[in-house]
Amino acid sequence: DEGVAFLVRCENRIIYHAGDLNWWHWEEEDDAYNRMMRGDYQKEIETLAGEKIDLAFVVLDPRQEEQFYWGFDWYMRHTDTKIVFPMHMWKQYEVQDRLIGMEVSEPYREKIMRIREKGQVFEL
């Protein structure tokens, strides 16, 4: 997948926006493609090592079926992020609850800001 991700420093805060950067894994793709996407994603996330990220927007895409959480989980386990907003949910907000209910999210689930509707406002 092509796109950009941003790490923004502003007013003593660090904000990360993943854009389309994700561990894209698609069952219809061959193993070589999926391995390449995994490696590319993991390499990019490694560049965030040592950053103390105040706020992040990270892909949690239900279209990836059973692999929907792989990129989000990798990001959260390999960065120092205080608050994270899932994105790319295609209005299927229940995907957040699915991740939060999984054992894998235990170390970071309290950092996930749950989005329930379009236009929802958050005060941080």
What are these regions (language model features)?
Residues D1-K52, G119-L124:
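Core dinuclear metal-dependent hydrolase active-site scaffold
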Residues D1-L7, D54-Q64, Y108-V121:
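A broadly tuned preference for mixed-charge, low-complexity surface segments
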Residues Y16-D20, A32-M36, L55-R63, K82-W90, ...:
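Active-site neighborhood of phospho(di)ester-bond hydrolases with catalytic His/Asp-centered motifs
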Residues T47, F68-L124:
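Binuclear metal-ion centers of metallo-dependent hydrolases, dominated by the metallo-beta-lactamase
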